[in-house]
Each structure stands twice: as structure tokens, then as C-alpha cells.
Amino acid sequence: MRIPIVAAFCAAFGSGLVCLLALTALAQTVAPTGAETAKGKALVDLNGMTLYVFDRDGAGKSNCNAQCAVAWLPLIADTDAQASGSFSFITRDDGRKQWAYKGKPLYTWAKDKKPGDATGDGVNKVWHLASP
């Protein structure tokens, strides 16, 4: 739940190092899990927030940076995180490690307010639920 609040603050009042540090502090150690959302079963983070994939990402490469990454928060992996099964990591342009599912980087949507929300599905016809 803290991630959307931090993202909203960063979008409204600035960006830069403070926001980067705040978002990095919310890194996830374990792989995402599946859960029911408002639009069906999807992968979720540790807080139960719906995860999404971006059509414009390449295999093993995020193309959502700068302002895009304020609205679509990369699911950052903790330095101790271990990949397993279909879950892996990509290295973002800023050097941080991001969780990926079947090679596709994973994100949360800043406008989802509570676990189970799935308001990002279909945004600009390029954002979709990350389905297990």
C-alpha cells in the first residue's frame, strides 16, 4: 500500500534522489504470488497489489523509465532476492534489479489504491495484468 502513496507524492511534488531512495526501500525479497483481483487472477506483490506487464518492454529489458516509472512502479527486487521458476530479474537502466515473469518486467500501477484493484489493465492498450 505504501508504494502507490510514495509514487503519488513523487508525481505531485518532484522526483529525483528522494523518490528513488523511497521506492528502492520498498524492494521485494520473494517472488510474486497469484491472487484474485477485480479482473480475475493475476500476479500480486507482497502487499497484494496487482502486477502488470508492458507491451513495449523487450525480453529482459524495461522500456518504462523516468516519468513512466513514476506511474508504473517497477517491482524492485531486494539484493537478497532469489529467482525461481518462471521468475527472474532484469537490470534497469538505473542499475536496480527488477522482478520479471517469463522475461517480462513487472510493475504496479500508482492509481491502484488497494489490494485487488486492477485499474491499470488495458491502459493505453499496452498495459495488462500479469497473469500466472
Predicted regions and their residues:
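Short helix-onset patch at the extreme N-terminus, typifying the N->h transition
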Residues: 6-9, 76
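Compact beta-sheet-dominated domain cores in extracellular/mature segments
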Residues: 23-132
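Positively charged n-region of N-terminal signal peptides that target proteins for export
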Residues: 1-5
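Bacterial N-terminal signal peptides
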Residues: 10-24
